[in-house]
């Protein structure tokens, strides 16, 4: 089956998130697709965020992961754990709908209608990378093929089927909410669900001011605009076959 709709994760208490989500929803509508909002989990610590989506926390596993996954400690920060819980809410909604859906974070931007391909069970379909803005990249066509990749950057735009969502929910219920969603899906692929990338990419994430500045905790380190995938000092994770479809410069 093709994607039925886009599920846009939105922080209802944050004005910036609402603005970004509206831009995202408008881009979906312009591409003749439908969308709905997923109310994000906000301002909860690890255990409360997990409980809000029916999950537990395995602290022993979290400690093991902290010693084996680079930067895993940040997965337990409020903003990141709430983001993970929000994606779990989206997984559950996909199961409720009973049809494939695209899950979009509020800063995603859809460039072309992507209801022209079947979303396969037990795969993560990566829909697009980060870009500096919404004008740098224009896909040359609708999605022509799906290419296997080992990993990708960002959880801002991807598609899954109800079967895939059920499998990930079952796994997360077993291990608990210990993974950050980036590590779980695309960066480390701890879910073990194979990744395929749409070629050309039909969606992007655009560089913007972060909405994580208002989380109710003291966190060391930078917050705000992040554009690492367009930084020549950061290796871009991509596949040569995707470059033709990109039709724009990308550092590799």
Regions found by a protein language model. Name each.
Residues 1-104, 108-252:
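An acidic/histidine-cluster motif and surrounding catalytic segment
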